[in-house]
Structures are given as structure tokens and as C-alpha cells.
Amino acid sequence: MSSAKLVEYLPAEPVAQPSSPPRANILGVGVHAIDLPQAADVIESAIVGGRKGYVCVTGVHGVMEAQRSEEFRTILSRALLVTPDGMPTVWVGRLQGHTHMRRVFGPDLMLEVCRRSIAAGHTHFLYGGKPGVAEHLRAVLTERFPAIEIVGTYTPPFRDLSRAEEVNLMRQVSLSEPDIIWVGLSTPRQELFMSNYLHRLKSKLMIGVGAAFDIHTGKIKDAPSWMKKSGLQWLHRLYQEPSRLWKRYLINNCGFVGKLALQLFRLKNYELEQALEYATELLDVNR
């Protein structure tokens, strides 16, 4: 095994986040009341300022996962940014007075951050997708943004990484030192991955963008604009992947509507968790 030195980030106690955009309360989950340019601004500022953190792109699926899992709810509360990925989260936010709130769709966020990164010189690493997808995405992004710096890709297995795979990933990231690791897994896998590996990988930010890898490489067709604006993109996804998604949408959508009614009519109080983040210290370790 190579004796190359790796850098591991060890989490300290969670501390209150510095000033950040206001949050809408979606069933107790704090979703930042922002639009696409503001989300890209936060990400850009974090990189320039040397902050370490992860970004969650969260819609109804993520909000409902947080109802079932305290661990997942905590992961969202510790995110640098939780963007409103679905129109229902935007509608609820606007009802709460966040009239400027707009949808921040994962694939759109990826393109906007990549576009801005060229002038800033920020670098990227692609983690996720089925075999060949990350490399395909690298080619797609390079064709669209010829000056973009994509310093590595990694296709994970559909399970937890083995110790050998962990070491291999850490070595690759340590050698390339990307500013951003884009994580293209499904919810909640990508959020769990970012939380578990944020302090173990030598990068600044991790951004979970779900289906963006498949959408940008044409594996999944994107929904028409009118379906996105009307909150019906889930129907478009369901049409393409009925056997995989029908249970998710049936359980999550129905459950969300029921719980949201309780919140909106003040029949149940969903307390908003304090936004936290981990302070970090650097520790050199040899593997």
C-alpha cells in the first residue's frame, strides 16, 4: 500500500452556524428560503472562505425521511445549506412569508455552480451513478464548459464501501484535493454518505444532487418546464420508473399532505431544529 499521507477531518462538537439565509419550517425541517443565484452565492462564498460543509437538495422525499429518522433529521440540521428541491416546499415557504423563495433543482444547481467555478478556478470531483455514468457526466460537463476542472470520478458500489474501497477513495480525493465533491446517489444514501465522509475526505464542500447525474447524461429524461413549475415532476419520474418509485411517491406524498395539514391548521407543532454544523480540526494520518 502506498505510504502517501492522507488528511482526515475529525468532527468536533456541533456549533451554531454563522449567519445564513432564513429557513422555512417544513414539518420541522429547516429548508433555506432562497433561489438558485442565492444558493450558488452561498456555495461560492463557502469555498472562498475555506468553510467545510455539505449541501442537501431536499424535497418532499427528504422531508418525509426526516419524519421517520432522527438521524436523518439531524443530518439536515447540520447541513451548510438545505435547498428547496420541490415546489411543495416552495409553496409552504411562501405561505410562511418567504415570498422570494424559488425552487433550487439539483441539476440546475450543478450547472450554475459549474458555470461560476470556471472564473473562480474551483475544481470538481464526481462521486456516484452506475458504472460509466460519472465518466459520461465528466464528458458532458467538459463539452458544455470546456475550461471546467474535473479532477476525478468515482463509481461506488450499491452498498457501504469496504475498508479497501474507503482507502482508495480517500487516496484519490487526497491527491486531487477538489473544492467540490458532487454526490449523485439517492436520498437518503447521499445525505448519509456526505455526513459520514465530510470530515474524512480532503475537499471543501460536498453537494448531493440525486438524479442530476442521470439527467445530465440522458439516462433519465427531464420533465417539461410546466410540470416542474406546477409541482408535477414526480409524475414524470413515476412514468419513467414506475416499479422503483411508485411506493416512494404513494407513501411520501400522501403522508406529506396529511402532516402538512396538521402543521398549516396548527393542529400539531413541528418545532424547527436549530441549525448546527461541525467545527473541524485537521489531523494528518497515515493509512
Positions of PLM-derived features:
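Short glycine-rich anion-binding loops that position phosphate/pyrophosphate groups of nucleotides
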Residues: V60-V63, L185-Q190, A212-F213
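A short helix->loop->beta-strand "cap" motif at the edges of active sites that frequently abuts
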Residues: K52, H122, L201-K204
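Conserved beta-alpha
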Residues: G93-Q172, S176
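Short, flexible loop segments at boundaries between secondary-structure elements
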Residues: T155-L161, K202-Q240
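Proline-aspartate-enriched helix->loop->beta-strand connector
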Residues: V173-T187, S203
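Short Gly/Thr/Asp-enriched flexible loops that form oxyanion-binding sites at enzyme active sites
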Residues: R138, E191-R200
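A transmembrane-helix-recognition feature enriched in membrane-embedded lipid enzymes
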Residues: P88-R94, A223, M227-A279
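N-terminal nucleotide/polyanion-binding subdomain common to many enzyme families
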Residues: S2-D108
